[in-house]
Every structure is written in structure tokens, then in C-alpha cells.
């Protein structure tokens, strides 16, 4: 990995600024490797990735932004370039990594760059009667108004709220609260609790994602962070009712439109299970631990054991809901066995009374 990063950086080749798949992810992984091993080469690699992330930014308006190839062109067929602004593939995710780099003492420039990123995001926010919202790109080439964590206002709001903790700039907190108020207007009642629609284009809404990307396990992170910052219990009550909406679908045994044959951290069971464990830690409510155990049992029932001598296990899953028949045995963290294994280890540590999970930059939860 380090060789790959150095090679790409030397050639000044493009790598996306997606927090889970591009330069920001390398900043995080390499710095964590440095912390674990004290080998300076990993710290240098993290700084290299951070430098390349910044080099790909453009001065736009009141801050900085990133112009990249249109995301998901392999699915939509739409090509070209756009300014990407969301958490998963855009500026908000890059901003979160700048905050991480600042807190880790990697760069004196990291916080000023996070501020420039946020100032551009404030500039491109869409004003609505219900509050502020952000889309995946500033100029969407296809209809996709997603209010949740990965590609919508919940993710951008999370970054702005987190930045407020470092700057005490009320403009960031006010924008984050406005984003949360907007999300609250996109809920749909379930038999118990409520869920937020996947996209606003679907009318009436019938698809409700449950995972981190567009479901309670992601948007709940935003609400929990607001609760931590403001100490306003309405945000915690909201995420609890939102989780009740998730449970009311019959998950994980019942697979709804928003919980298809995907078991990973991003869209599926592993991310939901981790979220349940964090809620258990916060509330001591045994229902969350019981739900995490149900998730684990379902994952075990869905795994495929190799007949080879290594006795490996894997999960055949569809990364994209729109292509359920295109399954792969993925190995990554957000999509694949690494993320599923991480949840199972997390659950084991909780059951043993010594909860352990490496804190991620896009999560307000930690045991440290």
C-alpha cells in the first residue's frame, strides 16, 4: 500500500477524495499504522496522501472544493466532471479527514483547510423552507435528493458540527442544526418509530435504507453528535425512535428493500450491528445488545465456508441495491469481510466486558 501511494503521488496521478476509497482513507490507515508501529515511513505516507488530497483541491468561491469525475458513472452512464460535496465521495468527507489530521497533529494546515472546506459547503447549501440541504454534487446531472449520511445533508451536517467543536464558530453549528431539522421533515412513520426516505424523488416513499449510508446507522451518528454538543435530548430521542423504525422492519431476518443481500459496514448488517453496540454502550439498554446478537447470528447463517485447507469464510453480497444479482465476495472494510469481521470482534469484546473498536473519523462513538 505504501509503495502504491508513493508511486501515485510521485506521478501526481488522480485518486478520488472519497473518504472510504481515496486519498483520505490512506491518510487514516497509514497514520493508524504509524501509531501502532512507530515506523516513520507510515507517517510520511499519511502526510503524502494528505498533501495529494489538498493538491487536488480548487479554490472556489469562499473556500476550496474538489472537481472530480461524476460518481457512479458505471451505473448511470453519465460522464463528465462535477464538484463533489457529500461525505462519502466529496468535500465533507475530505473535511472530516482534515479534522482527523489536525487532532492527530499531522499538519498545522489541516484545521485551516477544514475551515476552507466548510466555508465552501456553506456557500453551496440549498436553502429550503425546512432547513439547509446538500446533494452529492453542486450540479446534479441526475435526480438524486438523498437526505441521509453518505450523500446528503446528514453527512455534511456531521462534518460542520464536528468542525464547530474545534472552532466554536456558531455558523457551523447553526448550519448543522438546520440540516438536522431538514432531515426530521423527511421521516415516515412505521408500525413503531420512523424511517427517513432513501431519496425524495420516490413518491410515495417505499424504500428505506437501514445501514450507515442512508439509514439509521449513519444518520443516527449525526444526531448523536448534535446531542453530545448541545446536550439537547431531542436529538437522542430522535435517533432512538429512528432505531425503533429499523427494528419494526423485521431486520435482520426480514430483508426489506433497504436491506438487500448486502452484509457490510456501508449498506448492511455489520454497520447496523456496530451501531447497536454503540447505543448499548451509551444507554445500557439490553435491547441493543440483543439486536446486535441477532445481527451476528444472521451473518453466520449467511456466510460461505471455504472447502480449502485455509478454512476461510466469506459473504457473497451485492454492493448496489439496483444490481442484486451482481454479487461478489468482497474483502474490504466498508464492503466486505474485513468490516464484517470487525463487527463480530466488536461484539465479542462487548460480551467479554472489555468493549473495543477502533474509532473512525466519521463516527462520534468511541471507547477511549
Language model segments and positions:
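Glycan-recognition and catalytic cores of secretory/periplasmic carbohydrate-active enzymes
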Residues: 1-368
